[in-house]
């Protein structure tokens, strides 16, 4: 008779969870950050608020963002004027959009990842879907399963309303799923559309304006599995360890509340200061087993909550400017796409490494770190091991 121990050993993979493919997608509507204040104050009928507009212009100028992509077009907003007011009941209109559009955008990214992976989608055993908005039953995970034509027996996990740290969370979960289920191939999708947070400006709620200056829409998908099939699957990064922690004295630093008016966004404390003050502790805990203490010896993927967070982390850790180059590039080209950001950066790092002819997928380096920051304040830390690039 077979023992439980023997069953468990047979169920577990041999090697570490590995990223096997990455795909990204954005809505077609691209907005220029330099002209966005004019558009935003016009579409929200707020042009008379000249001082507030000047303040918003400064926020956009300091954001280090060149452009963003948004599902919301001028036509859609004109058809839904309640979304353009500051605090008008508008949740129904917002929900009607995102419950359809979030799975659709996720499908675009997932289709690209599956194509790169090169295996039949019937081999996908698990689906992890993450989005900040559009809570529904059955959820976006179910809708995506139908849109992609995945097997009805695919094992699904739906993550709603986690926020900006969740790009790290999905990797942590995918790692556990892949390593504890031999032969598992996990499709991870983060799809974010900021239609739930868009609203007109207010003098009394400047943190909402910060969100209007930073957030963009995008979806990213990755396929994770252990023990890649030689000559069939092409490993990109190994997921070595993953941790989550709540930062001390950070209650209420970032809050989001789903109300009749949509998702309201609140910044209550010095978020960049809290993150930069605590980040070295997370690094030390993650890299002590590897005997790594030189943070410039790593390749970096950090959620770009905003330029101030990146600047303070860079200063606190003494990072060379090129360490956060890929992170800053994604912020500049797409804005803050919440959970999808770090997966876009992961894609950028491996592409840039290949383009520049470097010897590994991680900018020529062996070890890397991926950070997610978000409400809580919650920090996700993922240790990555790059893969050698064969010519």
Curated annotation (Swiss-Prot):
One of its GO terms (molecular function) is protein homodimerization activity. One of its GO terms (biological process) is flavonoid biosynthetic process. It is an enzyme of class 2 (transferase). Its EC number is 2.3.1.74. This is Polyketide synthase 5. It catalyses: (E)-4-coumaroyl-CoA + 3 malonyl-CoA + 3 H(+) = 2',4,4',6'-tetrahydroxychalcone + 3 CO2 + 4 CoA. Pfam families: Chal_sti_synt_C (PF02797), Chal_sti_synt_N (PF00195).
């Amino acid at each position: 008779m077979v023992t439980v121990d023997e069953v468990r050993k047979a169920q577990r993979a041999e090697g570490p969870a590995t990223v096997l493919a990455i795909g990204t997608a954005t809505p077609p509507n691209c907005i220029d950050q330099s002209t966005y204040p004019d558009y935003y104050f016009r579409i929200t009928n707020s042009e008379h608020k000249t001082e507030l507009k000047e303040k918003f212009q400064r926020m956009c100028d300091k954001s280090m963002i060149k452009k963003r992509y948004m599902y919301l077009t001028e036509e859609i907003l004109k058809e839904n004027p309640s979304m353009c007011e500051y605090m008008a009941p508008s949740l129904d209109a917002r929900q009607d959009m995102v419950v359809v559009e979030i799975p659709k955008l996720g499908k675009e990214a997932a289709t690209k990842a599956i194509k790169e992976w090169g295996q039949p989608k019937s081999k996908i055993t698990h689906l992890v879907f993450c989005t900040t908005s559009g809570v529904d039953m059955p959820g976006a995970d179910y809708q995506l399963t139908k849109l992609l034509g995945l097997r009805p027996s695919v094992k699904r996990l739906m993550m709603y309303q986690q926020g900006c740290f969740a790009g790290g969370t999905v990797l942590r979960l995918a790692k556990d799923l892949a390593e504890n289920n031999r032969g598992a191939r996990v499709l991870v999708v983060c799809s974010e559309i900021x239609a739930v947070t868009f609203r007109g400006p207010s003098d009394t709620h400047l943190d909402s304006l910060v969100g209007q200056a930073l957030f963009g829409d995008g979806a990213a998908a990755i396929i994770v599995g252990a023990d890649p099939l030689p000559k069939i699957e092409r490993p990109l990064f190994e997921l070595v360890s993953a941790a989550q922690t709540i930062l001390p004295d950070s209650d209420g630093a970032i809050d989001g509340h789903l109300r009749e008016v949509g998702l309201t966004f609140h910044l209550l404390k010095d978020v960049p200061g809290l993150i930069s003050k605590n980040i070295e502790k997370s690094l030390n805990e993650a890299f002590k087993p590897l005997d790594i203490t030189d943070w410039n010896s790593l390749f970096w993927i950090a959620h770009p909550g905003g330029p101030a967070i990146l600047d303070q982390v860079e200063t606190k850790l003494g990072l060379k400017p090129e360490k956060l180059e890929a992170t800053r590039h994604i912020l500049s080209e797409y804005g803050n796409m919440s959970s999808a950001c770090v997966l876009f950066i992961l894609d950028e790092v491996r592409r840039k490494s290949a383009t520049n002819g470097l010897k590994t997928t991680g900018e020529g380096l062996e070890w890397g770190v991926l950070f997610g920051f978000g409400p809580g304040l919650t920090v996700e830390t993922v240790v990555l091991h790059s893969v050698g690039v064969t010519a």
